[in-house]
Amino acid sequence: MEPLNRTEVSEFFLKGFSGYPALEHLLFPLCSAMYLVTLLGNTAIMAVSVLDIHLHTPVYFFLGNLSTLDICYTPTFVPLMLVHLLSSRKTISFAVCAIQMCLSLSTGSTECLLLAITAYDRYLAICQPLRYHVLMSHRLCVLLMGAAWVLCLLKSVTEMVISMRLPFCGHHVVSHFTCKILAVLKLACGNTSVSEDFLLAGSILLLPVPLAFICLSYLLILATILRVPSAARCCKAFSTCLAHLAVVLLFYGTIIFMYLKPKSKEAHISDEVFTVLYAMVTTMLNPTIYSLRNKEVKEAARKVWGRSRASR
């Protein structure tokens, strides 16, 4: 056998959409607009939930955290992706690749848990209305979100360290437009079983388990709604649950496709398309589906905007 050509890695080449120049020219204005809408929408929701005292409730605390996650997640890859769409040199340093991998894993994992926590909050609000404020106290909200942030960060750092310490051989071309951990692992010439097993275990804990919890919560909510005598109230509550469930299905469905699908040695353009869908469309739609259609949020936004104009 020939010895493995191990080299010290200083940078990676992100293949991305290199083979599709027409697609690159189309994606740049589209992704730029989506990125701007994502930042503006989520920043507005986060600001309103903090500045308006009437929104200092558990549901808007979690919505504020969701907006914070979306604001933290998209800058981990979108600005560099936009630069690469216009550039012929699509490289990323080893250190930046590791940071990008860690932050994207951490924020994505935290959002998985946040969606489950939000489903539990919806269940308590609809199914246990008299005990809601006792069961879902502010202290519990902070503890749940703090635990989610810390645990997912530790998990992501561990996955990144295990993966990036592997030896890399031959070309350093990542068949993706970001440093996705599965794409980087394909370049490793060492034993990747430990990293893959750790990643699979984390995927199972953060995908099927929370998703099953969310589905159970919504089934209990639906059963409660069907017992509500008022048809108008029933329809309103049911439509709200459908909106939340739509985002959950979009978010979890794309992740499950990317991480739990059968392995393939060749990269497919569908990976990139689904990653854009998961990473950008969901973060852009979250403010609209979760908050901007809510009358309380609209009223709070008008009050905050009015106070800001009056103070000038």
From Swiss-Prot:
Ranges per topology, Cytoplasmic: 47-54, 121-139, 218-237, 293-312
Disulfide bond positions: C97-C189
Membrane side Extracellular: residue ranges: 1-25, 76-99, 161-197, 259-271
PROSITE patterns noted in UniProt: G_PROTEIN_RECEP_F1_1, G_PROTEIN_RECEP_F1_2
Localization: Cell membrane
Residues the record marks as carrying a glycan: N5, N191
Keywords: Cell membrane, Disulfide bond, G-protein coupled receptor, Glycoprotein, Membrane, Olfaction, Receptor, Sensory transduction, Transducer, Transmembrane, Transmembrane helix
GO molecular function terms noted in the UniProt entry: G protein-coupled receptor activity; olfactory receptor activity
Membrane topology of this protein: Multi-pass membrane protein
Principal subcellular localization: membrane
Gene Ontology cellular-component annotations: plasma membrane
GO biological process entries: detection of chemical stimulus involved in sensory perception of smell
Membrane-crossing segments per the record: 26-46, 55-75, 100-120, 140-160, 198-217, 238-258, 272-292
A Pfam cross-reference name: 7tm_4
SUPFAM superfamilies, alphabetized: Family A G protein-coupled receptor-like
Family: Belongs to the G-protein coupled receptor 1 family.
Biological role stated in the UniProt entry: Odorant receptor.
Protein name, entry field: Olfactory receptor 13J1
Organism: Homo sapiens
Taxonomic lineage: Eukaryota, Metazoa, Chordata, Craniata, Vertebrata
Protein's gene: OR13J1
